[in-house]
Regions:
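ATP-dependent small-molecule kinase phosphotransfer cores
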Residues: 39-107
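NTP-dependent small-molecule kinase module
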Residues: 2-3, 141, 159-190
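P-loop (Walker A) phosphate-binding loop of NTP-binding proteins
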Residues: 14
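Hydrophobic positions on the alpha1 helix immediately C-terminal to the Walker A/P-loop
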Residues: 22
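ATP-dependent NMP and nucleoside kinases share a basic, alpha-helical "lid"
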Residues: 95-139
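Post-Walker A helix-loop "phosphate-sensing" segment adjacent to the P-loop in P-loop NTPases
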Residues: 28-39
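Conserved lysine of the Walker
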Residues: 19
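Hydrophobic anchor at the beta1->P-loop junction of P-loop NTPases
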Residues: 11
Length: 190
């Protein structure tokens, strides 16, 4: 998207990494520094809105039951919509690099999404696996999958590899931001 004046930042992180906390703090920092319009977009929400407006689903849970080919079309359409938002502003896309499924890791950013979004930077919010496991166990407000510290470590390593593959397609940079316990403000400043 050569005529784009804005920027697309993709922000990812495992459940329990503190991605949302860091994102909220970063948005406040950008606002206080006088950046132009910054739009936060949840990729899954845009996909759901696309499917609902097409009459394919009534609620978000129905998304998983759509045929794979239709889901891919919705993914592409959502990515193009987000890319258009970034023509003249900063868009931060909140999504997951990989989703752990019973069949293995599912890419959150397949090639056709990366090509449409053409992100300027891909940001991975990480923490020590022990910190993530601890945060998940303390968070009673969310239904989180139970993963061992070793599985969390593998998941983060796989996300790094996936981020580099996405960066290769789009010519993006990749930044890893460590969000240690009690240090969200420092992570957001990065």
């Amino acid at each position: 998207m050569a005529d784009r004046q804005g920027k697309v930042f993709v922000l990812t992180g495992l459940p329990g990494s503190g991605k949302t906390t860091v994102l909220d703090a970063a948005l406040e920092t950008l606002k206080s520094l006088g950046f132009g319009e910054v739009v936060l977009v949840n990729y899954g929400t845009v996909m759901f809105e696309e499917a609902r407006s097409s009459g394919l689903v009534e609620n978000r849970d129905q998304m998983r039951s759509l045929p794979a080919e239709i889901q891919r079309k919705i993914q592409r359409s959502a990515a193009e919509k987000i890319a258009n938002m970034a023509r003249d502003k900063i868009v931060i896309v909140d999504t997951h690099m990989l989703i752990r499924t019973p069949e293995g890791f599912l890419p959150g950013l397949p090639m056709w999404v990366v090509e449409a979004l053409c992100p300027n930077i891909i940001i991975l919010v990480e923490a020590f696996p022990e910190e993530i496991a601890g945060r998940r166990s303390k968070d009673t407000t969310r239904s989180r999958d139970v993963e061992s510290v070793e599985d969390i470590n593998l998941h983060q390593q796989m996300c790094r590899s996936a981020a580099l593959a996405c960066a290769e397609i789009a010519g993006s940079t990749v930044k890893i931001i460590m969000n240690h316990d009690g240090k969200a403000e420092e992570a957001a400043a990065e």
